Amino acid sequence: MKTIFRIAQTELRLFFYSPIAWLILIIFAFQAGMAFCDTFSYQLQNKALGRGQIPFQTVILLLGDSGSFFKVLNNLYLYIPLLTMALMSREYSSGSIKLLYSSPVTNFQIIGGKFLAMMLYGGLMLVILLLQVVFAFIFVKNLDIPLILSGLLGIYLVLCAYSAIGLFMSTLTSYQIVVAVGTLVILTCLNFVGGLWQDIPVVQEITWWLSLSGRAKTFTAGLICSEDVVYFGVVIGLFLTLSVLKLQSTKQHYSWWWRWARYGGMVCIALGIGYLTSKPMFMCYYDTTETEHNTITREGQRVMNLIDDQLTITMYVNLLDKSAPAGMPENQMSNLRELKPFLRFKPDTRLKYVYFYDSTDHSRFRGATASLPLREQMLKICDDEDLDPEFFLSPEEIHRQIDLTSEGNRMIYLLERANGRKSFLRFYDGMDIRPRETEITVALKRLVTDASRIVFLTGHGERSLYWNDKGGLYSLIQRNGR
């Protein structure tokens, strides 16, 4: 450990001997300060104009979409590659790497020392953000400190992940510009990989987990999830290990297939860990917000605890339904995200998808196309969207499984307990078609409680009891029983 600390100390000195480290700190402080001052001045203007005090000042000033932490987080990728591009490239170009190889220092110590230097530099960047926290603590009543600490943890983990990626890229070449560009390319790939191969089972879960996009926003929202912590740990560990392997292959001669086998093996191990830890049964959560904003309501928790047997949630997707694109395989992980707050309290819940085509009162087609036979409509959509027709059950096949005619054969969730109790959870018309916490809780509650007797008053302008539009909110029964 002493050797690692010495290397880190030397690396920090080299950082601050050049103007880049100082310049980055100054620009970072200026950017973070301007973001904070803009939001703070807007709140002062509201107060001066008599608009009253807006609640949730912790989120508005620091962690919300207009907060300084959020804006800083979106720009971190601009700073870290400028620092990491010289970590190992400088050793290659100056020839000092030969001195390191001939000295009694291991490859792990070299990589560990340089990464520790980046961790310490990242700590200096957090100190700048802590100054804003101190200022907010003075002027904001009841500041949510645990929420802020969660946000700072997320930012720091992103800094460390970017540093590990940049360090690995710097071991590949002596050209610093190539390292910086390569780091940006890797970061871009990690941000967009979550949208790749989402129509392939298992692979969709791996690429979704591998995506870096939005990881830190979970922390800034105040929710610390073991999946996200493990993700950053695996990414950091993977790229540091790849860096050590690269130095070993430089010192010792290995055949090309053995080098690639070692790299591939480490990547497979990392993906395997990620796949396992992304399963709900292996997840742990800690909601740091004072109001438990990231946790379902107490009533929702009570309902989930009452379901003491196997719960199965099946999504029935009618290809001819307007809402069908939201239920296609490429959107399965997005749908899982909506259910995740409930799966937190019952991680053994089974999720299933059934795809079919049938007549519906919510059809994609209008005019002459809508009069075509159902199979021809299905084939037309499959041809337009490059889908396999054999993937969808025919009307006769789906009718043998379930009768959805009472729901207009629309896309719908079926919630089913092992004791046989069932409940439908609908999708709706409009911009936001997915059911939210209130609607999900109501559907789950029907699995654990008997139907109540409801009396309606009519004849005084009330909404109609008999309106039967499943996707609308025009009738009172649809509004309260979504």
Model regions: which residues?
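Aromatic- and glycine-rich beta-strand/loop motifs that create alpha-glucan
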Residues: 1-25
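Long, hydrophobic alpha-helical segments
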Residues: 64-90
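Short, surface-exposed patches at the edges or C-terminal ends of soluble domains, predominantly
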Residues: 44, 199, 217-220, 226, ...
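Terminal transmembrane helical anchor/hairpin motif
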Residues: 39-63, 172, 179-180, 185-252
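Secretory targeting signals
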Residues: 34-37, 55-74, 112-174
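Transmembrane helix boundary and interhelical loop/hinge segments in multi-pass membrane proteins
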Residues: 81-101, 115
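Hydrophobic alpha-helical transmembrane segments of multi-pass membrane transport/permease proteins
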Residues: 19-44, 71-80, 185-189
